[in-house]
């Protein structure tokens, strides 16, 4: 089954809704049995140092628009990008998502086996409101 952005498909008790990516593919919101999981795929605020400011601003606007589509929905588990390659901006998308959605538990992904991003995220003052809702690196079984 192929789903493009902004489509909804039911598979028995499973409901799959897609969101546009800011890179490749789509993001998924999957609901079943009263639980909801969000998998961001490559949906992230992909801002890069050295890129033209207008490109980074357009990226941020696209990302925020997609996250806005989740407004008012409870997300039990969200798998979100936390990419160390973005250097100082590594948590920008993650932070925005957590501050603008009703997410119970967030699981960083796309961190290229660089588990140091977990501690870096926890050290950011902006993460204080949701810090306790982010999975710890010890919850990942394929560590180092």
Language-model regions, residue ranges each:
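Core dinuclear metal-dependent hydrolase active-site scaffold
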Residues: 2-74, 139-144
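Conserved acidic residues
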Residues: 76-79, 104
């Amino acid at each position: 089954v192929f789903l493009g952005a902004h489509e909804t498909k039911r598979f028995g008790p499973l409901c799959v809704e897609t969101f546009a990516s800011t890179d490749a593919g789509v993001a998924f919101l999957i609901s079943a049995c009263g639980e909801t999981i969000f998998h961001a795929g490559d949906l992230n605020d992909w801002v890069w140092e050295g890129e033209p400011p207008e490109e980074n601003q357009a990226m941020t606007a696209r990302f925020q628009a997609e996250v806005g589509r989740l407004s008012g929905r409870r997300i039990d588990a969200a798998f979100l990008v936390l990419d160390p390659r973005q250097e100082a901006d590594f948590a920008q998308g993650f932070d925005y998502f957590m501050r603008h959605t009703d997410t119970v538990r967030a699981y960083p992904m796309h961190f290229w086996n660089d588990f140091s991003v977990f501690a870096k995220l926890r050290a950011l003052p902006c993460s204080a409101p949701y810090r306790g809702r982010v999975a710890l690196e010890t919850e990942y079984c394929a560590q180092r």
